[in-house]
């Protein structure tokens, strides 16, 4: 549905071609630690990382406008190169953006090679976020590769009332000794088995994406599944079996994630 010019964010803005709400059509800054550009509509695919929200605003200005940072959810992803943690972070941002939220998604790399540890981040908020930094005290942590528990302090800064979601076939209590005394909630899901079952290969990022949505409720599950179906049908237009496999992955992961 097109938005009439008089409802646009700018007086002389062009008519929308994306069918998004007026909030989503607001002029957005798209930036990352490597690129900065400006876009006026949602892109189909992403660069390395994006911040989606209207024009930048300082923390002092946000206080004057009464912005409540308690409405913000911060998520940190831990994985290895090639496992899709960065892609999952971007897809989560896409789904949250389409539900009318302000979002950030960006990665942090070490050595850029397959199998090397990487970190990715999400901020999801009901209001614009003036923060432009890594996330040091996340509400949620997603661990895409269980072996990282032995070498990386994945719970660093994780809020005690938050949660960690780990890709593992082991029960949560068996993994607690590796979490360096973290007292909060621990969820596990065998993302590898789920992806092998529905996709015939090891793609843990798809089940882990669904698991963090189920645990955090940063996006309504129904909205999330609807947006993901639309994205998959666009990306894999000539591969209906791949679309259905991914959708089955998401649905089973949301059911099977356990505390």
Show which residues each predicted segment covers:
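Polar/charged alpha-helical tracts
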Residues: 1, 5, 17, 66-68, ...
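Cationic, amphipathic, low-complexity alpha-helical segments enriched
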Residues: 1-30, 34-38
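Positively charged N-terminal leader segments that act as targeting/secretion signals
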Residues: 14, 18, 36-53, 65-66
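Enrichment for repetitive, rod-forming helical segments
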Residues: 24, 48, 62-63, 87, ...
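Alpha-helical structural elements
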Residues: 30-31, 40-41, 47-48, 72, ...
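Active-site cofactor/cluster-binding pocket
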Residues: 68-259
């Amino acid at each position: 549905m097109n938005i009439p010019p008089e409802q646009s964010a700018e007086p002389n803005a062009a008519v929308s071609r994306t069918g998004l709400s007026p909030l989503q059509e607001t002029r957005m800054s798209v930036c990352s630690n490597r690129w900065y550009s400006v876009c006026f509509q949602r892109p189909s695919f992403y660069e390395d990382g994006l911040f989606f929200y209207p024009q930048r605003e300082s923390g002092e200005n946000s206080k004057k406008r009464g912005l409540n940072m308690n409405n913000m959810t911060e998520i940190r992803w831990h994985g290895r190169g090639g496992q899709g943690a960065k892609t999952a972070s971007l897809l989560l941002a896409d789904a949250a953006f389409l539900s009318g939220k302000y979002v950030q998604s960006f990665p942090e790399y070490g050595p850029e090679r397959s199998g090397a540890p990487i970190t990715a981040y999400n901020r999801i908020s009901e209001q614009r976020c003036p923060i432009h930094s890594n996330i040091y005290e996340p509400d949620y942590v997603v661990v895409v590769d269980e072996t990282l528990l032995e070498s990386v302090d994945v719970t660093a800064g994780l809020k005690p009332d938050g949660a960690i979601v780990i890709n593992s076939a082991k029960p949560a209590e068996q993994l607690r000794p590796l979490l360096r005394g973290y007292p909060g909630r621990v969820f596990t899901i065998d993302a590898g088995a789920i992806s092998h079952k529905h996709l015939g290969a090891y793609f843990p990022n798809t089940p882990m994406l669904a698991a963090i949505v189920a645990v955090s409720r940063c996006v309504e599950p129904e909205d999330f599944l609807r947006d993901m179906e639309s994205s998959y049908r666009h990306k894999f237009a000539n591969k209906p079996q791949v679309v259905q496999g991914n959708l089955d992955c998401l649905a089973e992961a949301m059911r099977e994630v356990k505390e």
